[in-house]
């Protein structure tokens, strides 16, 4: 497997690292936060989630969806701002995130951190697993 590594240092906090494991290899990103974005396969509407990398796992801090439709009803307490429904999901920290990669949807996943975005799961392959790097 190939290893692609992006490092960044900061005086304000010690960065943690996430690893995205796919059939293509391992993408390692040193970061304390990231955004996942994808397009809903039926409604063709963008969806975004903001995640924090913490010792307890991945914490979903905010989500946004640009509209509503089949299976995309805004959550209770969602606020419509600039064409996006913003809300804070109430889920416990996750030890890993598993992203489907069918290659049959409108787009793959976009993982953004540290001002750079990476396309994942644009072709049919095994699910992509995002974990904290050891």
Give short role names for the model-derived ranges.
Residues 5, 50, 84-86:
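Intrinsically disordered, low-complexity N-terminal regions enriched in serine/proline/glycine
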Residues 21-69, 74:
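N-terminal secretory signal peptides
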Residues 13-16, 33, 48, 82:
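Short, surface-exposed beta-edge/turn micro-motifs
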Residues 73-134:
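Mature, soluble, non-transmembrane domains
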Residues 11, 52, 56, 90-92:
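Short linear sequence elements within intrinsically disordered, low-complexity coil regions
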Residues 7, 37, 48, 52, ...:
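Residue-identity detector for glutamine
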Residues 1-9, 15-24:
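Sec-dependent N-terminal signal peptides of Gram-negative exported proteins
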């Amino acid at each position: 497997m190939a290893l692609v590594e992006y490092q960044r240092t900061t005086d304000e906090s010690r960065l943690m690292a996430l690893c995205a494991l796919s059939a293509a290899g391992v993408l390692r990103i040193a970061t304390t936060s990231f955004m996942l974005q994808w397009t809903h396969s039926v409604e063709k509407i963008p969806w975004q989630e903001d995640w924090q990398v913490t010792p307890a796992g991945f914490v979903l801090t905010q989500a946004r969806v640009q509209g509503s439709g089949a299976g995309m009803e805004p959550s209770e307490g969602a606020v419509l701002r600039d064409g996006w429904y913003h809300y804070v999901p109430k889920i416990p920290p996750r030890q890993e995130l598993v992203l489907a990669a069918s290659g049959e949807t409108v787009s793959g996943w976009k993982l953004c951190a540290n001002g750079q975005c990476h396309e994942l799961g644009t072709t049919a392959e095994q699910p992509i697993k995002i974990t904290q790097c050891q």
